[in-house]
């Protein structure tokens, strides 16, 4: 994101932290400022977590515009909302088009009115590329905060009038677990760095246990994404 959107050749931890801080600021804004629809942190858990194990939200933030390329025309609510469903604006590398959404939490900041938000979400629901699971209603939790995003003076990000941070629970995040598993398997096959952990008091069995747990988590996400509605129809046949 830093390279593509902000034209930073070699992003440092400062660049990354400034981007992450915008996300954290958006999530906690409702605790600090007034808005039309304030969202409590406990509401995230209620709305985003359908099962205890499926509790890893995918975070997306828009717009991410460099200070040098700051638009004179501000992006509309519909545009920033649509940008939240683009893989390019995600904080975790995975393709939501290959998965299904279980729930979405949209946190708007700045010059935003509920009417525009409702229209933008209605448009999103009509898009074929954005799929929701069929065993729960297509829930969009919305938070609107009147405080516009604040940026660090002389920083990489442009000052914008409105922004949105989306927390979504999608089965596509399992791609991140698969990547992690693959990297672990390559290193663990050679027992790379294991001696350091064992030397500090860990047991080798803990690595195998953690690997099995992550494999089970991948399976859980896979099962959640299955078309339960279709499966029930096939089982039931023509019975009413």
Swiss-Prot record:
Its main location: cytoplasm. Pfam families: Tubulin_C. Disulfide bonds: none annotated. The active site is at residue 43. SMART domains: Tubulin_C (SM00865). The keyword Ion transport does not apply. Its cofactor is Mg(2+). GTP binds at residue 17. InterPro entries: Alpha_tubulin, Tub_FtsZ_C, Tubulin, Tubulin/FtsZ-like_C, Tubulin/FtsZ_2-layer-sand-dom, Tubulin/FtsZ_GTPase_sf, Tubulin_C. The keyword Thylakoid does not apply. It is found in: Cytoplasm, Cytoskeleton. Its EC number is 3.6.5.-. The record marks 240 as: Involved in polymerization. Tubulin is the major constituent of microtubules, a cylinder consisting of laterally associated linear protofilaments composed of alpha- and beta-tubulin heterodimers. Microtubules grow by the addition of GTP-tubulin dimers to the microtubule end, where a stabilizing cap forms. Below the cap, tubulin dimers are in GDP-bound state, owing to GTPase activity of alpha-tubulin. Dimer of alpha and beta chains. A typical microtubule is a hollow water-filled tube with an outer diameter of 25 nm and an inner diameter of 15 nM. Alpha-beta heterodimers associate head-to-tail to form protofilaments running lengthwise along the microtubule wall with the beta-tubulin subunit facing the microtubule plus end conferring a structural polarity. Microtubules usually have 13 protofilaments but different protofilament numbers can be found in some organisms and specialized cells. Belongs to the tubulin family. This is Tubulin alpha chain. It comes from Octopus vulgaris (Common octopus).
């Amino acid at each position: 994101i830093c390279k593509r959107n902000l034209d930073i050749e070699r992003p440092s931890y400062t660049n990354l932290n400034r981007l992450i801080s915008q996300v954290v600021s958006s999530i906690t804004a409702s605790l600090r400022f007034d808005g039309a629809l304030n969202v409590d942190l406990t509401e995230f858990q209620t709305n985003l977590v359908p099962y205890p194990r499926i509790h890893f939200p995918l975070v997306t933030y828009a717009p991410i515009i460099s200070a040098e390329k700051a638009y004179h025309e501000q992006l509309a609510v519909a545009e920033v909302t649509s940008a939240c469903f683009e893989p390019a604006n995600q904080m975790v590398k995975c393709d939501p088009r290959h998965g299904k959404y279980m729930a979405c939490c949209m946190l708007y900041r700045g010059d935003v009115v509920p009417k525009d938000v409702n229209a933008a979400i209605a448009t999103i629901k009509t898009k074929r590329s954005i799929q929701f699971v069929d065993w729960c209603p297509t829930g969009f939790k919305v938070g609107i905060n009147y405080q516009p995003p604040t940026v660090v003076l002389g920083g990489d990000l442009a000052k914008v009038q409105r922004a949105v941070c989306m927390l979504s629970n999608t089965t596509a995040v399992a791609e991140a677990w698969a990547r992690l598993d693959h990297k672990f398997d390559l290193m663990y096959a050679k027992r790379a760095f294991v001696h350091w952990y064992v030397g500090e008091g860990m047991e080798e069995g803990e690595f195998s246990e953690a690997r099995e747990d992550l494999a089970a988590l991948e399976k859980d996400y896979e099962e959640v994404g299955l078309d339960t509605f279709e499966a029930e129809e096939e089982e039931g046949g023509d019975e009413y």
